[in-house]
Structure formats: C-alpha cells, structure tokens
Amino acid sequence: MEEFQGYLELDRYQQHDFLYPLIFREYIYALAHDHGLNRSILLDNVGYDTKYSLLIIKRLISRMYQQNHLIISANDSNQNQFFGYNKNLYSQMMSEGFAVIVEIPFSLRLVSSLEATEIVKSYNLRSIHSIFPFLEDKFPHLNYVSDVLIPYPIHLEILVQTLRYWVKDPSSLHLLRFFLHEYYNWNSLITPKKIIFSKSNPRLFLLLYNSHVCEYESILLFLRNQSSHLRLTSSGIFFERIHFYEKKKYPVPVEKVFVNDFPAAILWFFKDPFMHYVRYQGKSILSSKDTPLLMNKWKYYLVNLWQCHSYVWSQPGRIYINQLSKHSLDFLGYFSSMRPNLSVVRGQMLENSFIMDNAMKKLDTLVPIIPLIGSLAKVKFCNALGHPISKSTWADSSDFDIIDRFVHICRNLSHYYSGSSRKKSLYRIKYILRLSCVKTLARKHKSTVRTFLKRLGYKLLDEFFTEEEQILSLIFPRASYTLKKFYRGRIWYLDIFCINDLVNHE
C-alpha cells in the first residue's frame, strides 16, 4: 500500500470515485508486474519476467489512446502480433493493471482499518500449519460435517453488478465488461481452478470471486447473528496480503468483518458453540456438535440464499451431511480425518492400583498421495503409476538450472506438507522428484542413471536432503510493546501467500 499512496493522488480520485484514468499510468503496470513476480516465487516460472518491459507498456498505453486499436475481436487468432507480442500478453497486461486499480478502494479501507486497530505488519511470518490448531481444538468435539461446493453465478454480469457496491466509477465497470466479453473463455469460469488460480489472469478473477462470495457471506453472517444470541468469534486468514490479524474475541459488526476480510482472502470462517463455517477457495465446510436437524437448517439457509439473492442454482440434495468420525475433509491440500488415539494411564491410590484406558480423538492430517501423483504426472515428472521419468522440456537447460528447478519444487512441497502427521507419502513425492531430476540430467548427457551417478557422485543431490529448518527462518521478534498485546490471544501466521499448482490438484 505504500506504493499506492506514494504514486496516486488519492484525495482527488477518492473525491470523485474516478479510477478509469489510472489505466493509462505506467506505474500501475509496474505494480502489477511486481505482484506477479512475488507470486512466481512458489510457482514454476514460465517466462513471465522476460516478456515484460517498459517499452511494451509505453506502446500498450499509446495504443489504448487510439480507440480503434483498443478493441480486438475475440475471434482473432491468439497469435496475431501486437508490436511483436501476441494478444494473450496484451490482454494479460491490461487485466492485471485493471485489477490493481479496482483493488484501490478495498486497499484504502484495509489500511484505515489497520491503523484504527493498531495492527502492525511483519515480513517474517510463520508456517501455514499454524492454522490447524483451530481444527485440532474444535473439530474433535463435533459430530457432523458437510462439504459444500460454492456455486458460480449463471452470468458474468452478476459479478459486475456485485462490484458496483464497491467501485462507483462507471467507466471502470464498462472496461471490466470489455475484459469479460472479449478476452476470456466463458465456459472456463465454471471451473474455479482454470480461472481463479490461473497463471494468466489470477488477480482480476480472484477479486471478482471474492466480491461475489463476500456479498452472500455478509448476509449469512447476519442470519447467524439473528439465530443466536451468543458471542461471535470470527477469524480471517489472508494469502494475498503480508499482514497478520488478531483473532477477534468480541462481537464484530458485519460491515467491519467483511471490509477487513475482503481484499484478497480465500479463507474465512466463523464459529460458535453450535455451528462452524469454514471457506477455502471454492469450497465451504459446515460442522456442528448438535443433531443433523441443525445442519439441515443451515443447509437450506445456504441454498435459499444462493438461489434468491445471488442468482445461482444449487440443490439441497447435493449437500451431504456426514458423521465426522467416518468422513475425511479435503482442507488446505490435506486429507484431514478424526482417528482415536488410545492411551493407557496407570494410577495408584494407597495400596490399590488401577489402569484406565483413555480414548481421545486426534486430528489426522494426511498427504493426498494419489492426487499429487496425478499432478506430477500431468507436468511430466512421472507416469500415471508414479514411476519417475525425465523432464524432456528441461533437458536443454544447464545442470544448475535443472537441479535448481527440481529443488525449488521439492522444498516447496516439503514445506507445505511438513505438517502432516504421517510423512511416508511426502517421502515418496520427494523420491519421485529426486529420481526425475537424475533422469533428466542423464538424458541431457546421453547417459544412464547409474553411470551418471557413478561419474558425478551422490553429492549432486545434497540439495534435496537439506533440512527445512536450515532454509526457513521462523523467528518472530517480541520486543515491541504493541506486539505483546497480541500474544495474549491466538494469532495465526502465514508465509505461503500463493498455493503451488501441484497442491491445487483436481
């Protein structure tokens, strides 16, 4: 946000709610490019950096001033050259710059709310696995759970209408319609992975999706407050911001919750003694300690809310209510289930001794090995059975680049899944990547795997065996007096702001 405040004349634009002229400013595209580079830290770089230059941005802006050249038919070939670059790059640059502009109203509200609550920033954040204490503390005491797939709008115009409550600039909304109608495949919106987590245009559709979900969740929260007089505890986890937030232990107004939680959050939940609601990406989880009657009530709340207010179609029969003890949750890339953890306690009173069997439920977080192998097979690291193969498209790179790419992916997956209670599946994934790296190097040097390892030695793969503790710095300073106040409550930290494509398996 310092970049926004440093470049933009915020008072003048806020006064008139007029954001459209910013599309012609060069620094907007620079901010979008910096955001894309930060996301690529956890992704396989596909040449994002090499396609962008200040000269291309200048040419793009000069062309946008000419109205006849701005409109490109969707029927044109994707390889039609625009000053030497194809139409996909042209539309990608404009959509990313436009997403930065539309985020300005939300970012300003976010900064003002942070200043009001004295929540400070930290760039040394902890692991994503600190989210799971929420499940470990509460879910073992619950009985029923339901996985809900959040439906998508029937028409893209619904997304534009939702954004009108936040962006008052008609020109910006018309430009948004232009992007939706001219540049993007309408059928792909139905599949959330292809749009929300796409490498080509993640920011714009992430913004549209969050505004759509935020709209109906604000009403859902209102219904929850009307149905219960108990105190509400709400929490927000942000993957697109490098801020951390205190768990709120007090009743929170509806407007404040969603102004704070909206800008780029893909995980949000509230809970009370009767009902727990968790949203992650395009899914939501309902869990309850009570009877199935309460679960059915909230299920019909959701369906009626989607159909009557958000104009999306959903059927109650597609939302199944399961017993938590017999059902596994697909949450944050893990398979989470409850398993009994038996412990024997021997006690003695005077001369009499006795033995007590204490059965406790424990959250079991497993690595989804089959979907991960499918993801590795899709990008040609192994076959469908999990047997490692060489990455032929990388064989032309240098040895250092090949090893660095494999180590980057291996460390990323190891970091993400190191919180698993059973690491056997994680070791298998690391084995596939190590052997695929060796086969790729052997293919490049036209040798066999055994001969290649015998010639260079096994020290070649030492990078794969580096312990995670030697790579990640998880030290958090406690010297500040302001920070000491937040340590009294539960604070959750994230350092993964973009989930790897291999984690977002189908």
UniProtKB/Swiss-Prot annotation:
PANTHER family: MATURASE K
A Gene Ontology cellular-component term: chloroplast
InterPro entries for this protein: Domain_X, Maturase_MatK, Maturase_MatK_N
Key words, A-Z: Chloroplast, mRNA processing, Plastid, RNA-binding, tRNA processing
The family this protein is said to belong to: Belongs to the intron maturase 2 family. MatK subfamily.
Molecular-function annotations in GO: RNA binding
Protein name: Maturase K
Known role: Usually encoded in the trnK tRNA gene intron. Probably assists in splicing its own and other chloroplast group II introns.
HAMAP family, A to Z: MatK
Protein location: Plastid, Chloroplast
Primary location group: plastid
